[in-house]
Every structure is written in structure tokens, then in C-alpha cells.
Amino acid sequence: MLRRTVSNFAMSPYMLFISDLAKTGKLKGIRTPGKFVGKKYRQLSAKEKAALQQRAKQASTPAMTAYRRMAHREMSNKSVPIEQRRANLTKKWNETKQAQREKAQKAQKKTKSAKSKVKKAAKKSKKSKK
């Protein structure tokens, strides 16, 4: 199973091209972005496509690696039927992702700007100099 699905997790040159366009803001305000991106991708030169393919080979996300590791570990348990293993893998992966989201939200809430404290300290230092 995993031998076939690993290629589905890999980043394609086309997806890299889309993310590059999105980062530069060229997709904003376009009514049909898929059509626009497809047209632009087909217009790329061979050198540009080769560069994208090279970047795509090197691209790997931590989530892909973590999922592969978890899938390998879960699927190696041969005493459980394959459908059950898939269900367990899906359930555990969703729980992991949910826990990560909650952790990120908590960290985001805790982080506050130090701007007001810096301003107060600057005012105190100005007053003490006078």
C-alpha cells in the first residue's frame, strides 16, 4: 500500500509553481486562478520546468515525513486486518493534527507584544534623565 501512496505525498513541480505565484500575489483578483496557472505553467521554458522539478525533488514537509513514519509503524502490525489498520492510522493522524492545532492556538494566545512595556521603559528613562 505505502509503496503506491508515497508518490502521492510528494510535492509536484506544478504545486511549487502554484505556491510561488500565490506568494508573489499574482493570483489575487483573478476570477479563474486554475486556468491562469495552467496557462502560465505551460508557457514555462524547459529550463524553468527543470528548476521546478529539481526543487520538487528536494521539497519535503515535516507533516509528510511524520505521516510516513506513523503509517509505516501502524501498517506493520500484521495481526490486525488492513481495513482496521487504515482506520486506526486515520484516527491517530487526525488526533495528532488536532493536538498540534490546539497547541499552536494556545501558543498564539500566550504571545503578547512587548511594545507597551518598551514604551513605558523609554518614558521612565527619559523622566529619570531630566
From Swiss-Prot:
Which stretches does UniProt call biased (Basic residues)? 106-130
Kindly state one GO CC term assigned in the UniProt record. Answer: kinetoplast
Which residue ranges have biased composition labelled Basic and acidic residues? 92-105
Q: What is its main location?
A: mitochondrion
The alphabetical list of record keywords is: DNA-binding, Kinetoplast, Mitochondrion
Task: Give the top-rank taxon of the lineage listed in the UniProt record for this protein.
Answer: Eukaryota
Instruction: For the region Disordered, give the residue spans.
Output: 89-130
Q: List the GO molecular function terms.
A: DNA binding
- Record's SUPFAM superfamilies? HMG-box
Per its UniProt record, what InterPro entries does this chain match?
A: HMG_box_dom (IPR009071), HMG_box_dom_sf (IPR036910), Kinetoplast-DNA-binding (IPR052695)
Q: Which family does it belong to?
A: Belongs to the KAP family.
What quaternary arrangement does the UniProt entry report? Associates with the kinetoplast DNA network.
Q: What is this protein called?
A: kinetoplast-associated protein 2-1
Species in which this protein is naturally found: Crithidia fasciculata
Q: What is the lineage of its organism?
A: Eukaryota, Discoba, Euglenozoa, Kinetoplastea, Metakinetoplastina
